[in-house]
Swiss-Prot record:
Name of the gene encoding the protein in the UniProt record: rsmF
Active-site positions on this chain: 246 (nucleophile)
Cellular component, GO, one term: cytoplasm
Catalysed reaction equations from the record: cytidine(1407) in 16S rRNA + S-adenosyl-L-methionine = 5-methylcytidine(1407) in 16S rRNA + S-adenosyl-L-homocysteine + H(+)
Known EC number: 2.1.1.178
Protein name: Ribosomal RNA small subunit methyltransferase F
Keywords on record: Cytoplasm, Methyltransferase, RNA-binding, rRNA processing, S-adenosyl-L-methionine, Transferase
Pfam family, one: Methyltr_RsmF_N
Molecular-function GO terms, alphabetical: RNA binding; rRNA (cytosine-C5-)-methyltransferase activity
GO biological process: rRNA base methylation
UniProt-listed NCBIfam families: nop2p (TIGR00446), PRK11933.1 (NF008898)
Residues that, per the record, bind S-adenosyl-L-methionine: 124-130, 148, 175, 193
Intracellular or extracellular location(s): Cytoplasm
Length: 486
């Protein structure tokens, strides 16, 4: 039974729209959430994913605000985080409401082929659901800066970015309040899914509101005001900003947006989201924001606001000095050609036309747009590591295969397709015996279902596992095929 603090009920009763009832709200909070996932279109189309999973008993109900999001039905005893297809990065387990902010930011009118955003900021990124959703919407083009304040959550963010094959990300680990100072008016678009009271999450955490207090809400809202101001300062004139929370009270939602409008006046223009998807008007506020109460769409509670920065605004602090000792240098023409030839001739992968950078014996691939950010802030991770070099040649890195061995694979690529059982063995760090012995082929890309799992060394009679030790799984779930379609 859900635990709703009486002080919370008293506050929300005053804020609940007239057409919604408190009884319906409480009943919705007490229902389990529907299971939802988002297909990772960096690796597979939604149609192909449905074709892959329907024989395994999955049914798909489209989420109206996310083209690649679905409520799913399946055997709920299965731990989907251990599923082979999840480990491969074919899908992300993501609550339906949390797919709203990237959708609101990347509306067709704001993101067209002729005016693609080059630099996007996700100010509070971990664990990575919205970051990887935006990476897919950007089709791994441009630069996506993903920031996370918590050190432990940066590791989770990095793991998810790699798993999903998001190659154009640069990760930072800062308090989000510094971005307006360090990267003033640098981004075409900014998403801030702000830390909040989490009132909308009660359907998956029955105790989320047990200790609710107005003092806590007031304290959190002050942090949110500082964050949205920093995000606004980091936004270019003409750019778009989406502010979202998974909470329900006005202080953390409309109140934060109204604060920004009070400070910056006409430079802040609220954009209506009433036409974002069919039925959006049911959650649209007078300002044009989306205030998603859990009973409206049978989802988590959520808030989403979108605004345009109509004019430049003065920066609050002097521009910081450029930082020195950036550890990467551009590859020479000879080095760049060497790594391109290795990927093309040995692996069958055409490297994208991006910056090839070198650090010691490491070769990296950076987005071109990152050039403008060198020295302006310290980055935890940039782009993808391609390979290490030695006197014997190059040694490809796992993350490069995961990010690049998809659409860039040529027909001559050295791949070995494995069964689901063999894929499970591979992900658990074991070598794969080959049914028919043949000539050793050296480095090969191991694939399952057309998507890469990683590298192995073809020794003629077996595939010697080259999966990085830190990615070896203790458990891999093979979802069984059903005897009849559902």
């Amino acid at each position: 039974m859900v635990q709703l603090n009486q002080n919370f009920i008293d506050t929300i009763t005053q804020e609940l729209p007239a057409h919604l009832s408190m009884d319906e709200f409480i009943a919705a909070c007490d229902r389990p959430l529907r299971r939802s996932i988002r297909v990772n279109t960096l690796k597979i189309s939604s149609d192909d994913f449905k074709t892959l999973m329907q024989p395994k008993g999955w049914t798909f109900d489209p989420i109206p605000w996310c083209e690649d999001g679905f409520w799913i039905s399946y055997d709920e005893e299965e731990q989907l985080g251990n599923a082979l297809e999840h480990i491969q990065g074919l899908f992300y387990i993501q609550e339906a409401s949390s797919m709203l902010p990237p959708t609101a930011l990347f509306t067709p009118s704001a993101f067209t082929t002729s005016t693609k955003w080059q630099c996007v900021l996700d100010l509070a990124s971990a664990p990575g659901s919205k970051t990887t959703q935006m990476a897919a919407l950007m089709q791994n083009q441009g630069l996506l800066v993903a920031n996370e304040y918590s050190a432990s959550r940066v590791k989770v963010l990095h793991a998810n970015v790699l798993r999903m094959g998001a190659s154009h990300c640069a990760l930072t680990h800062f308090d989000g309040r510094v971005f307006g100072e360090y990267l003033y008016e640098s981004f075409d678009a900014v998403l801030i899914d702000a830390p909040c009271g989490g009132e909308g999450t009660v359907r998956k955490d029955a105790d989320a509101l047990k200790h609710w207090s107005l003092d806590d809400v007031l304290a959190i809202s002050e942090t949110q005001k500082a964050l949205i101001e920093s995000a606004f300062l980091a936004l270019k004139p003409g750019g778009s900003l989406v502010y979202s929370t998974c909470t329900l009270n006005r202080l953390e939602n409309q109140g934060v947006c109204e604060y920004l409008k009070q400070v910056y006046g006409d430079a802040v223009q609220f954009e209506s989201l009433s036409d974002l998807f069919d039925g959006a008007e049911r959650a649209t506020t007078a300002e044009g924001f989306l205030h998603v109460w859990p009973q409206i769409y049978d989802s988590e509670g959520f808030f989403v606001a979108k605004l345009t920065k109509t004019a430049s605004v003065p920066r609050l602090l002097p521009e910081p000095k450029l930082q020195k000792n950036f550890p990467f240098t551009p590859a020479s023409a000879k080095q760049a050609q060497g790594i391109k030839d290795y990927f093309q001739q040995d692996l069958g992968i055409s490297l994208p036309d991006e910056l090839i950078m070198v650090r010691d014996d490491e070769f990296w691939l950076f987005p071109h747009e990152f050039n403008a950010f060198i020295g302006r802030m310290r980055f935890q991770r940039i782009g993808i590591k391609l390979a290490d070099s030695s006197k014997h040649g190059f040694k490809v890195r796992h993350e490069a295969i995961i990010a690049l061995a998809g659409k860039q694979l040529s027909p001559t690529a050295k791949t070995v397709d494995v069964s689901d059982v063999e894929a499970k063995e591979y992900l658990m760090g074991r070598d794969i015996p080959l049914a028919t012995a043949g000539k050793a082929q050296g480095e090969v890309i191991v694939c399952y279902g057309g998507a890469p799992l990683g590298m192995a060394k073809h020794l003629g009679n077996k595939l010697k596992n080259n999966l990085p030790r830190d990615l070896v799984k203790d458990k891999v779930l093979l979802l069984p095929e059903q005897t009849k379609s559902l």
